[in-house]
Amino acid sequence: MQNLTVALDAMGGDFGPRVTVPAAVQALSYFPELKVILIGDRNAITSQLSSLGRMPDSRLSIQHCDRVISNSEKPSLALRNSQGSSMRAAIDLVAESQADACVSGGNTGALMALSRFRLKLLPGIDRPALVSALPTASGNRTWMLDLGANVSSDADSLFQFAVMGSALAEQHLGRVPRVAILNIGAEEIKGNDLVKRCAEMLSNTQSVNFIGYIEGNQLLQDAADVVVCDGFVGNVCLKTCEGTAQLFIDKLKTRMMASTIKGWIARMLFSELFTELKTLNPDQYNGASLLGLRGIVIKSHGSADVSAVVNAIGEAVHEVKRQVPSRISDRLEAVLLERHY
């Protein structure tokens, strides 16, 4: 069994060690091969461990850091003043091969800037991209990128996102994934020059199974395995999907928990529907990968609860086992050779 180490930014996210420490302990019970380095304020981390009846051991260690990068800190400022911060220390461990992956729920812009600075980009990649899985009506998943690492992108970057997303999805699915571009229509004539140029490039690439355009109303319909868009569009779509799913879950939960006869009827009629809707809960898909780097970095939701952070750690474990950066590099090399000839 392959042993692996995850560096967890214990101070990242809205709740810090109150969530990250219990999540680390749970993750250790799920993954026997896992070691976790908790990075942050030693006293705060130790206090949470004590409340769980757990202390540092051979699989769970603490690295003290005094500083936390705030969510309001600009990436450029965070990059200059990152020394001594929990996020920087977690990324440094990956850069120095002391950890196989990093997980953080902290400032997204700072995480991207620091990761790019310390880990560097893979050959053939101009920009990293955030990718995460979305649930679909069929029970499968669709990987979408970019989710906000870049506000705007050119056609070459979108093409690179498609290659990276395809390589990642293939490691999860065990088959060649279907890749589509998010557009305002499915017809070839629809869209701006950006998506048309990217579509032309993908159509001429045998290494990617490009199936054309899909529209926003198809995102959760299992119409594609990988959906490509720029970071502005992707982030808006992701937040809209998450908000809509949470709205339905909360509304139904409120109705079912009512102590009236209506609540009893709702529980009788909608219990199965509620179970189905819970599969749309964003927490179950927490853990966005920052693709295109020479190391594995997973971004957790800032508002993530314990189970959601466990899922983010689980994504890190999966990507380490599947050697995702190497798979992406191999795919890029094949695509570059194909385009050259």
UniProtKB/Swiss-Prot annotation:
GO BP terms: fatty acid biosynthetic process; phospholipid biosynthetic process
Catalytic activity: a fatty acyl-[ACP] + phosphate = an acyl phosphate + holo-[ACP]
Localization annotation: Cytoplasm
Keyword Cytoplasm: yes
Annotated pathway: Lipid metabolism; phospholipid metabolism
GO CC annotation terms, alphabetical: cytoplasm
Statement: the UniProt record of this protein carries the keyword Lipid metabolism: yes
Keywords per UniProt: Cytoplasm, Lipid biosynthesis, Lipid metabolism, Phospholipid biosynthesis, Phospholipid metabolism, Transferase
GO molecular function: phosphate:acyl-[acyl carrier protein] acyltransferase activity
UniProt main location, coarse: cytoplasm
Cysteine pairings via disulfide bonds: none
EC number: 2.3.1.274
First-tier enzyme category under EC: transferase
Quaternary structure annotation from Swiss-Prot or TrEMBL: Homodimer. Probably interacts with PlsY.
NCBIfam families assigned: plsX
Protein name stated in the entry: Phosphate acyltransferase
